[in-house]
Regions:
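Glyoxalase I/VOC metalloenzyme domain signal
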Residues: 1-40, 51-95, 111-245, 256-274
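Ferredoxin-like iron-sulfur electron-transfer modules
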Residues: 100
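Short, small/polar residue-rich loop motifs at catalytic or cofactor-binding pockets
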Residues: 103-105, 250-252
């Protein structure tokens, strides 16, 4: 990896945080589960915003929020105000208008036409996650849609996404054209060498789109890498979380987890295909 900070072009998911009724309890849970260390980035007198660091690199954050707790995914945009207008024009909903997050950046809360909520992030001093794709760090955020065809149309219109159908256990992989070139030129110069056996275009992949099942609502799902799914499941349960489901995929062993305050996320152990 390069020493150049990781930056995120328009349309690339760039950050995750979780809103929790008891942020300090959440910090204890996630700190033990993933090895995160926390510092408060909020100015004096403001509600705490706990930045989680992994090996000194920004990985995620915890903020105060109502029950049930939830995870949020932020997607990078060049202009948050314009992206909000485009979201509404494409049939989405604006849940909170653009607002400055101090010098860190500018953000807004929106939802797609199926109700899946996500955040927009126009970077200032904080471009997004610096710890990604290693154990304890964010891997991907996936969209689970009630109508994948309509969801494809919405996100393509908003962000210019393309989709790679791999014929495996996911509906399609989300790709941002040119993202691999951006990574190769900045924070990840070995990306193509490292992904030599991956499907064509995989260097542009930023997430996956799946169909919901069993009456599940449309939502964005945060996926965090772990070295050992079984060990991480056991730790999560010991700390009061619930394992909702497991899924053995070609490239990963997954488990859906509900944390002690109700926020759901997925852990992912990478494995080489047999």
């Amino acid at each position: 990896m390069s020493d150049i900070p990781r930056t995120y072009p328009q349309g690339v998911p760039c950050w995750i945080d979780t809103e929790q009724p008891d942020p300090e309890a959440a910090a204890r849970f996630y700190g033990e589960l993933f090895g995160w260390e926390f510092s408060n980035a909020a100015p004096p007198g403001a509600p705490a915003y706990l930045i989680a660091a992994l090996d000194g690199a920004d990985a995620a954050a915890i903020a105060a929020g109502p029950e049930p707790a939830r995870w949020n995914t932020y997607i990078a945009v060049d202009d948050a105000d314009e992206a909000v207008r485009q979201t509404a024009d494409a049939g989405g909903s604006v849940l909170a208008p653009p607002a400055d997050a101090g010098p860190a950046g500018r953000t807004a809360s929106v939802a797609d036409p199926q109700g899946a909520e996500f955040r927009l992030w126009q970077a200032g001093r904080r471009p997004g996650a610096q710890a990604v794709n290693w154990p304890g760090a964010w891997n991907f955020s996936d969209i689970r849609a009630t109508d994948t065809v309509a969801a494809r149309d919405f996100y393509t219109r908003l962000f210019g996404w393309r989709y790679l159908d791999l014929g495996e256990s996911v509906e399609s992989m989300i790709a941002v054209p040119g993202y691999g070139d951006h990574l190769e030129a900045t924070a990840d110069p070995q990306i193509r060498e490292r992904q030599a056996g991956a499907p064509e275009g995989f260097e542009d992949v930023v997430g996956a789109m799946e169909a919901t099942a069993g009456g599940e609502r449309a939502h964005w799902r945060v996926k965090i890498s772990v070295a050992d799914r079984a060990a991480s499941m056991a730790t999560a349960q010991r700390l009061g979380a619930t394992v909702l489901a497991t899924d053995d995929q070609v490239w990963a062993l997954l488990a859906d987890i509900r944390d002690p305050q109700g926020a759901e996320f997925t852990i992912s152990e990478f494995r080489e295909p047999a």
